[in-house]
Amino acid sequence: VAISGQPGTGKTRTVLRIAKMIEDKFSIGGFTTHPIREEGEIIGYNLKDYTTGEEELSASVRWDVKPRVPGKTPESTPLGIRLDAVNRIATESVAKAIEEADLILVDEVGKLVSESKEFSAILKEALKCGKPMLITMHKRSRNPLLQSIRKRDDLRTLEVTPINSAIL
């Protein structure tokens, strides 16, 4: 199952609710993405391993590193991404989930994690492994990795909106 929606509509909150409802019946592995805000603006993102709770800052407007991805608006400061952090949390947690979990949680497939070739490869492996997955993704992103996920016949996509997020 994929949960899509615009930024801020509650995709992460929705998958965490689902995970909490089923975690006593199924082992869950993977990661979640959490924005870091300062004065209402997103200045970075933490990635968190769902199983271990390990969390690491993986993107920040304060880092002058490559790769850099654009902010939400043309005026926004681009985010510098630490691929080592992406690989340590996102890639490793999904790889471990392929081996050990009943359900693979990937929150979120987007510009942050898709900059990592290692993550893209392990996500493709996860999609082929036959285990159920719970994925969040931006509704309109043209990212090639997201486009390939959207085209899958074996994936059901639900859209989170400001109106339905409270009931999902």
Residue ranges, per PLM feature:
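Conserved beta-strand scaffold positions in the cores of enzyme catalytic domains, especially
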Residues: 28-30, 105, 155-159
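Phosphate-binding/switch loop-helix module in NTP-utilizing enzymes
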Residues: 66-120, 124
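Conserved lysine of the Walker
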Residues: 11
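Hydrophobic positions on the alpha1 helix immediately C-terminal to the Walker A/P-loop
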Residues: 14, 18
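N-terminal phosphate/diphosphate-binding loop that engages ATP/GTP or pyrophosphate donors
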Residues: 20-75
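Hydrophobic anchor at the beta1->P-loop junction of P-loop NTPases
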Residues: 3
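The conserved Walker
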Residues: 7
